Amino acid sequence: MPAFSRRLTAAFAAAFLLLSVSAVLAAPKSFASSDDAKEKDEPQKFLPDYDKLVQGKDADWVYFPKGSLKGTYKTVMVKDFEHNGKSRDSRDAARDGKEYAEQWLEKEGFEVVEKNADLIVEGNVFNAWEPSGAARYWGGWAANPGVGLELLIKNKSGEVVGELRQKAKGSTVPDAVENGLEDMCKSVAAGK
């Protein structure tokens, strides 16, 4: 009998350990507990709910309170992008945001309009960088130009239906903006 209870106890302990580990692995990683949230030079002032962002499929961080937007909404209007990054590169990257967002939202099946849209997309560039000096030549892919982007998506009544945050790299800053918005628009269509 004691051997049976030891085996039973060991089996319960193993099952408990498996359930505990699987619960931890299954929980989506949140932005608030990530290293990205601790970056001092990347403002977190544009989106209303940074604590609700979770790791996304295509975009780095996403929050869609009602799931996928593609079937529910048909038309979209993209506003000019803002920037709260401190560099000139951030300002320049913000100029490219609207055009690339419209391009990729159309490719995902949304109709881009100038007014009376089902969805209103607001964008922000929170950081943009261009490597300097020898880093550009000796740093490899890690030294490519990059950009940090945020999208706030509202329906026509002003209710937030999506928030996204993404860092992307490219051969130039405009290329990084396009790469980031491509991933973000895929997430908008999929709702994850």
Residue ranges of model-derived segments:
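Extracytoplasmic/periplasmic, Sec-exported soluble proteins
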Residues: 70-73, 85-97, 141-145, 168-180
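Surface-exposed short loop/turn segments
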Residues: 29-31, 103, 107-111, 115-160, ...
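Compositionally biased, intrinsically disordered linkers/stalks adjacent to structured regions
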Residues: 174-192
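Bacterial N-terminal signal peptides that target proteins for export
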Residues: 2-12
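Low-complexity, intrinsically disordered segments with a bias for serine/threonine
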Residues: 9, 24-26
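A structural "domain/chain start" motif
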Residues: 26-99
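Sec/Tat-exported extracytoplasmic proteins
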Residues: 80, 85, 97, 101-109, ...
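Bacterial N-terminal signal peptides
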Residues: 11-20
